[in-house]
Amino acid sequence: MHLLDVTMLHGPAVGGVSRYLSTKRRWMRDNTRVQHSQLVAAARAGRGEDGEYLLPGLRIPLCGPLRWPIDPMRWVDTIRRLRPDVIEANDVGSAAWFALAAAHKLDIPLLGFAHVDLVRFARERKGMLAERVVIGYMRAFYNRCDVVIAPSQYMRTRLAGWGIDRVVVRHLGVDATQFHPRSRSTNLRARLGLAESTRLLIYVGRFSAEKRIGVLLDSLQALGPRHHLLLVGAGDTPPLPSNVTRMPFVANTGVLARLIASADALVHAGDVETFGLVYLEAMACGRPVVAAAGGAASEIVDANCGVLARPGSPAALAEAIEALYARDIDALGANARARVEAHFTLDLSMHRLLALYRTAVAAPQASVPALVAT
């Protein structure tokens, strides 16, 4: 079987979608005989690593490394030459429509993976009219896919509310061998110039509006010097309180795992996460999670491995952090690790995805929607 992933969300600093794709590519290479290719928009045409094909795209202002795919004929012709058995579109940009056209020409299934809640972003940034436009756009694309993959029940419910059907849930997974409690280091506080008694929290991710960085920083300011936050990622931030240290984006998985495992807990104020892979990375490292009770957080973080806070409230987030420290953090971390091992390993996630791909390829085109029942 030849699987082709198509996306404009390319580059290590882009976020969870890019990490999902690079992790999947490595897993397929190391654990299966599946031929896995990836077609992405980049600065120029060429070949990347491990079956990665690059086609030119226009730079999107204020969007970092993201590029908007252009030249539809070139995209469609490239896909036809690659001759995949199944295509997965990982965003709803122009490349997704090029993939749809190619899938029709090749008479193969197209799966759309709804990683991002664009509708909520549109409403928060541009208002209700933009929300309606984006709903119509997403419905137009996803209802042309044979199957739509949602990373959580939360996202499945959102998609259904927009009139998108044929949706199946496939949770993401974390490499629990790379993200592991053994990565813990005892000298992180010393490196940050902190006393051993300091309560050390970590945030990992983009510094963007939907991550509610302002709520997070305000909660740390309210908690005061007894608590310290290590903020790891890329983007612009408001002025930082004195008990917050910023660190640039970390591409090396081993270094990132060591940072996470060496903190007391992960804290995240974002309330629109369609999954929240970083929750799993922390839990796999044996660290509990404090998260906003919005999006898919409650599907991952339960009372045995963390604390959920009322969304959008610095005071509520600060209270949740205090509540975490009133409990046995190491016991919560052990529970978190056990939960990952039982439900959210990379192997489990990839095997479930692989079964979906194989069924889609084997099924007659007309019966592919029956996959939703799997």
Language model features with spans:
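Conserved donor-binding/catalytic core segment of Leloir-type glycosyltransferases
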Residues: 4, 194-211, 217-221
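Donor nucleotide-sugar binding/catalytic pocket of nucleotide-sugar-dependent glycosyltransferases
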Residues: 135-184
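Short acidic/histidine- and often glycine-rich active-site loop of Leloir-type glycosyltransferases
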Residues: 121, 169, 239-240, 293-308
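N-terminal subdomain of nucleotide-sugar transferases
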Residues: 1-45, 50, 54, 221, ...
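Aromatic "clamp/platform" in nucleotide-sugar-dependent glycosyltransferases that forms part
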Residues: 271
